[in-house]
From Swiss-Prot:
GO MF annotations, alphabetized: rRNA binding; structural constituent of ribosome
Functional description taken from the UniProt entry: One of the primary rRNA binding proteins, this protein initially binds near the 5'-end of the 23S rRNA. It is important during the early stages of 50S assembly. It makes multiple contacts with different domains of the 23S rRNA in the assembled 50S subunit and ribosome.
Protein name as annotated: Large ribosomal subunit protein uL4
Assembly, per entry: Part of the 50S ribosomal subunit.
HAMAP family registered for this protein in UniProt: Ribosomal_uL4_B
Cellular component GO terms held in the UniProt record: ribonucleoprotein complex; ribosome
Keywords: Ribonucleoprotein, Ribosomal protein, RNA-binding, rRNA-binding
Pfam families given in the database record: Ribosomal_L4
Region listing for Disordered, in residue ranges: 46-71
Family: Belongs to the universal ribosomal protein uL4 family.
Stored InterPro entries: Ribosomal_uL4, Ribosomal_uL4-like, Ribosomal_uL4_dom_sf
SUPFAM superfamilies in UniProt: Ribosomal protein L4
Source species of the chain: Shewanella amazonensis (strain ATCC BAA-1098 / SB2B)
Coiled-coil zones: none
Gene from which this protein is expressed: rplD
Amino acid sequence: MELVLKDASRALEVSETTFGRDFNEALVHQVVVAYAANARQGTRAQKTRAEITGTGKKPWRQKGTGRARAGGIKGPLWRGGGVTFAAKTQDHSQKVNKKMYRGALMSILSELVRQERLVVVEQFAVEAPKTKELKAKLKAMDLEDVLIVTAEVDENLFLAARNLYKVDVRDVAGLDPVSLIAFNKVLVTADAVKQIEEMLA
């Protein structure tokens, strides 16, 4: 199959497997959920009454003081006491094998092509790390909510996009399924397309 370049009068021959496969919603959902879960720290921790440092002695006698009866100072009703159902550190990570991950990426890329949300250009760069210059360039291409994918990290492009809302710059190695579906359009250079094919082959 062919992808037409927006800034050149030629088409790019690409693999049907990478850019023309059916959309597997269940697979994409599973991989996106796993990706988000793997980003979680899961390091929160609270103490139960058993883990609180302090005496187990009864604070005052049962009867005769006029105060409410109390058996200890570490209960959840007390200031500084334990938490009833204390949160514990946990591992939220989910295993996704390479074949599934690659399959999800190819499924997303194919759907972007079908929906005409994948914009392929010969090359894309800015001369200086200026947000104004990048904004004007994107406006000329009628792009606003866009993920820019280049073959290698372009520092000028990265710095220029850093202060733009709904614009992100990634190299092929930094591609992930969540970023691909988070933006309205995905702008990819011809070199990046070739790298993506090699990566997912």
